[in-house]
């Protein structure tokens, strides 16, 4: 069984968009670098060094496609030596074994709209009217995508990485933005349902613990 929460979406992705590794696509083939802005440059930021921004180290991104932790740091402490990103950007772990394990997520709720994080992330920024962050996340979390990327890593031992050039030149069938948004809606709805179920299970466990406590 797939331990990943994303496992539910693999078949949905294939059904809607086909095998992303196939060159026989129903949609026009594009370089991934044409479908998103890869590792966008940091703009001039009107923040003081004491202003807070969100900080996301590698451990804050789970292997099932979610942010599990995010802290606030003073901009002056993290403005150098870290990766820059914004809300709705997609993070892709480029180093082994994080890449093979599926680390990646869409970033939301950044303090002052700015995030800084590990240099071992590639950042994929969706282009308005061309790509959805949920399609980009789903594509880059597909096991077949990661397996192909693993074969194209450079470096040695525990320092192997997926290059920005590899992602830039990866050929993929680009679905119409309407189809991507339909996939996004399905993804969000299923995610919301899982959240409700998880909260209900926690509530039931709490009740059960209380009742057992009374018996004891």
Predicted features, each with a name:
Residues 33, 43-78:
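DNA target-recognition patches
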Residues 72, 78-79, 110, 156:
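Short, solvent-exposed loop/turn positions at domain surfaces
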Residues 114-122, 154-181:
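A short glycine-rich beta-alpha junction/loop motif
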Residues 1-45, 176-184, 188-216:
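Non-catalytic DNA-recognition/assembly elements of restriction-modification systems
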Residues 81-83, 87-141:
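A short beta-sheet element
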Residues 25-28, 45-53, 151-153:
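Short coil/turn segments at secondary-structure boundaries
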């Amino acid at each position: 069984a797939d331990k990943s929460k994303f496992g539910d979406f693999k078949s949905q992705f294939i059904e809607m968009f086909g095998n992303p590794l196939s060159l026989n696509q129903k949609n026009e083939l594009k370089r991934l670098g044409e479908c998103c802005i890869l590792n966008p440059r940091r703009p001039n930021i009107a923040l003081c060094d004491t202003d807070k921004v969100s900080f996301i180290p590698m451990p804050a991104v789970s292997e099932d496609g979610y942010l599990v932790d995010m802290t606030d740091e003073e901009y002056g402490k993290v403005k150098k030596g870290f990766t820059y990103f914004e809300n709705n950007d997609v993070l892709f772990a480029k180093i082994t074994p994080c890449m093979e394990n599926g680390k990646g997520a869409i970033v939301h709720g950044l303090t002052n709209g700015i995030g800084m994080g590990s240099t071992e992330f590639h950042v994929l920024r969706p282009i308005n009217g061309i790509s959805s962050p949920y399609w980009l996340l789903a594509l880059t979390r597909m096991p077949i995508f990661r397996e192909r990327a693993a074969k194209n890593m450079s470096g040695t031992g525990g320092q192997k990485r997926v290059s920005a050039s590899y992602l830039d030149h990866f050929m993929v069938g680009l679905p119409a933005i309407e189809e991507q948004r339909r996939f996004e809606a399905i993804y969000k709805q299923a995610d919301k349902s899982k959240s409700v179920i998880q909260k209900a299970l926690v509530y039931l466990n709490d009740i059960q613990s209380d009742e057992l406590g009374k018996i004891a």
